[in-house]
C-alpha cells in the first residue's frame, strides 16, 4: 500500500527522494542494469563513451517531490486509478473529466513497455466510453499509436523513436488537429515514394490514420471485472494501512527524523553511493587513469573471427538470457501471488466485496442517467445541422462519403482537402475554422450518413453552376490522388457526381426561368411603318 510512500517521505523530512523510483525502474530489467549497459560500453569503447556519460548524467539527476504531491499521485493515480473514471476533484470543486478535453488526445504506447503497456495506456477509453456514439457525443478526438518493442524509457529518449514517431507526430500536428471526433489509429510506415535527396519537403515516412473503434480498443485492453475486484481490494487495504501508519507511526517518525538525518540518508542511497565510491577523488583513480592511457596507446585491433572475441559475445548473451529468465520467473511469481491473494473471498469480504455482489467495483461514468440524457440532447442538436451549410460543407461531406469505405487516410489526402476547401472559407481562413468544419461534418456523417449525403444538393442552392462543376471535378482529382479506387468507392464517387449534377441543374433552372420572363425590346417606328405598308 501507499503507507510506504508516506514512510519514505517522512524519512526525507517531507521530501520524497526520486532515486527510489529510479532504483525500482532499474530492478525491472536486471539484465540491462547489471550487465548489458556496462558490457555495451566496453565492447564499443571507441564510440560509446560520450553517449554513456551523457545518459548517466541525465539518469543520475534524481529529482525530489514534496510529500503531499507524491502521496496524492500514488493514492489517486497509481492505486486508486481515479483519473480514468472522473473521480478526481480540484481544490475549488471542479471535476477532472477527460471527456471534457476538446483538443485531440494522442496516446503513444509500446508492447515492450512493462510499466505502461497498451492495455493500461488505453484502458481509460473503455472506462469512460461505452461505444463510439459516446465519443462522438462528447466531440472528442483520440489518436493512438503502438510500437512493437521499445521500452518505457525509450518512448521518451530513444533516438530511433525520436527520428520516427516523435518527428511524425510533430510534422502532422495540423492533420491530427483537424481529425473528426472519434477514435483513430495512427500507423507510420516507410514512404512508398523514393526520397529525393536535397529536397527538404521529402519525407522518409508516410503517416496513415485510419478510423478505429471502441471495440478495437477493447480488444487491446481486454477489461476483466475480476481483475477490477482485485485492484479494488488493494485500494481499500492501502487506505487502511495508510490510516494506521498516519495514526500510530507517522507522529514518531516525524519527531525522530531531522533535516540533517534526512541529508545523510539521501547521500547513503545505493544509487548515489555508486557515484561517490568511485570518482576522481578515489585514491586509486590516478593509477587507473595512467593504466587506461597505456592501454589506449598500445591497443591492437582483432579480427571478428577471433575465437576469444566470439566467446566474449557468447558469454555476454548467456548472462543476459540468464538474468532475463530470472526476471520473467520473478514477475510471474509476483503476478500469481497477487492474483491468488486478492482473489480470496475472505480478503475481498474484508474490503467490502461480497461473493454475489454484481455491482461493478469501479464507477462507470458512461452508464449514469445524467450521461445518457446529455448524450441524447447532443445528438438531437446535431440532427438540426444536417440541412445547414454551403459549398465547403458539401465538399467535406462528399469526400467523407467516398473515402468512408477505405477507413483510412494519409497526409496527402488532408493536404488536398485543405487546398480544395480553402477558397470557399473566405480570406480569413485559419486551421481552427477548417478543423471545426471537418469535425462537425464528420459528426453528422456518423449520425445519419444517408440523410447527410442526400442533403448535399440543398447546400448548393446559392452556388453558381460553373463553380459547382469546377468543385465536382476537383473532388474526383482529390479522391484519386494516391490510390486506385475500389468498386465501392467508384460507385460512391458516381453517386456524389450525380448529386452535384443535380445541384447544377437546379442552379441553372432559375437562370433559364429568369431569361424567359425578360420582356422583348420595343419595336422601332421604322418597323411599324413597314408593317403598315
Spell out what each predicted region is:
Residues 59-95:
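Mobile cap/lid helix-loop segments that gate and shape the active-site cleft of serine hydrolases
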Residues 1-31, 134-136, 140-141, 146-149, ...:
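A catalytic-pocket lid/entrance helix-loop region that shapes and gates access to the active site
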Residues 115-120:
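Conserved alpha/beta-hydrolase "acid-adjacent" motif
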Residues 133-233, 326-330, 334, 338, ...:
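Catalytic active-site module of serine/aspartate enzymes centered on a nucleophile-bearing elbow/loop
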Residues 1-68, 182, 197-299, 303, ...:
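Alpha/beta-hydrolase-fold enzymes
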Residues 101, 107-109, 113:
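Short beta-strand/loop motif that positions the catalytic acidic residue
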Residues 356-533:
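Small-residue-enriched hydrophobic alpha-helices in membranes
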Residues 250-388, 393:
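Extended non-globular C-terminal regions
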Amino acid at each position: 500500500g501507499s503507507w510506504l510512500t508516506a514512510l519514505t517521505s517522512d524519512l526525507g523530512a517531507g521530501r520524497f527522494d526520486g532515486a527510489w523510483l529510479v532504483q525500482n525502474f532499474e530492478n525491472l530489467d536486471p539484465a540491462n542494469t547489471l550487465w548489458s549497459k556496462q558490457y555495451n560500453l566496453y565492447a564499443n569503447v571507441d564510440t560509446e563513451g560520450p553517449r554513456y556519460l551523457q545518459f548517466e548524467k541525465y539518469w543520475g539527476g534524481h529529482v525530489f517531490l514534496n510529500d503531499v504531491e507524491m502521496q496524492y499521485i500514488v493514492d489517486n493515480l497509481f492505486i486508486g486509478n481515479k483519473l480514468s473514471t472522473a473521480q478526481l476533484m480540484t481544490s475549488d470543486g471542479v471535476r477532472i473529466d477527460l471527456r471534457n478535453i476538446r483538443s485531440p488526445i494522442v496516446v503513444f504506447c509500446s508492447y515492450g513497455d512493462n510499466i505502461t503497456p497498451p492495455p493500461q495506456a488505453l484502458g481509460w477509453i473503455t472506462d469512460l466510453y461505452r461505444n463510439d456514439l459516446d465519443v462522438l457525443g462528447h466531440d472528442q478526438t483520440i489518436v493512438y499509436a503502438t510500437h512493437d518493442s521499445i521500452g518505457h524509457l525509450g518512448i521518451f529518449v530513444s533516438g530511433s523513436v525520436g527520428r520516427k514517431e516523435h518527428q511524425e507526430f510533430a510534422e502532422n500536428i495540423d492533420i491530427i488537429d483537424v481529425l473528426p471526433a472519434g477514435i483513430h489509429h495512427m500507423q507510420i510506415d516507410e514512404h512508398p515514394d523514393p526520397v529525393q535527396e536535397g529536397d527538404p519537403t521529402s519525407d522518409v515516412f508516410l503517416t496513415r490514420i485510419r478510423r478505429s473503434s471502441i471495440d478495437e480498443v477493447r480488444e487491446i485492453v481486454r477489461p476483466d471485472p475480476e481483475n477490477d475486484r482485485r485492484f479494488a481490494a488493494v485500494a481499500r487495504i492501502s487506505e487502511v494501512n495508510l490510516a494506521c501508519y498516519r495514526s500510530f507511526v507517522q507522529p514518531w517518525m516525524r519527531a525522530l527524523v531531522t533535516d540533517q538525518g534526512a541529508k545523510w540518508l539521501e547521500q547513503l542511497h545505493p544509487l548515489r553511493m555508486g557515484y561517490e565510491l568511485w570518482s576522481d577523488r578515489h585514491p586509486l583513480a590516478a593509477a587507473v587513469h595512467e593504466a587506461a592511457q597505456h592501454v589506449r596507446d598500445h591497443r591492437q585491433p582483432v579480427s571478428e573471427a577471433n575465437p576469444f572475441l566470439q566467446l566474449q559475445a557468447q558469454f555476454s548473451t548467456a548472462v543476459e538470457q540468464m538474468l532475463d529468465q530470472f526476471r520473467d520467473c520473478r514477475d510471474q511469481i509476483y503476478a500469481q501471488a497477487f492474483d491468488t491473494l486478492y482473489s480470496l473471498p475472505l480478503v475481498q469480504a474484508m474490503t467490502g466485496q461480497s461473493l454475489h455482489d454484481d455491482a461493478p467495483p469501479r464507477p462507470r461514468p458512461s452508464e449514469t442517467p445524467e450521461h445518457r440524457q446529455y448524450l441524447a440532447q447532443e445528438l438531437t442538436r446535431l440532427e438540426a445541422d444536417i440541412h445547414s451549410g454551403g459549398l465547403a460543407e458539401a465538399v467535406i461531406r462528399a469526400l467523407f462519403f467516398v473515402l468512408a469505405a477505405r477507413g483510412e487516410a494519409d497526409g496527402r489526402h488532408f493536404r488536398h482537402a485543405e487546398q480544395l476547401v480553402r477558397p470557399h472559407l473566405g480570406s480569413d481562413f485559419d486551421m481552427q475554422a477548417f478543423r471545426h468544419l471537418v469535425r462537425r461534418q464528420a459528426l453528422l456523417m456518423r449520425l445519419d450518413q444517408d440523410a447527410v449525403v442526400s442533403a448535399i444538393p440543398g447546400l448548393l442552392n446559392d452556388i453558381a453552376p460553373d463553380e459547382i462543376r469546377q468543385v465536382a471535378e476537383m473532388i474526383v482529382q482529390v479522391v484519386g490522388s494516391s490510390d486506385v479506387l475500389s468498386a465501392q468507392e467508384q460507385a460512391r464517387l458516381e453517386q456524389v457526381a450525380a448529386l452535384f449534377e443535380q445541384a447544377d441543374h437546379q442552379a441553372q433552372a432559375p437562370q433559364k426561368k429568369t431569361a424567359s420572363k425578360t420582356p422583348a425590346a420595343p419595336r422601332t417606328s421604322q418597323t411599324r411603318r413597314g408593317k403598315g405598308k
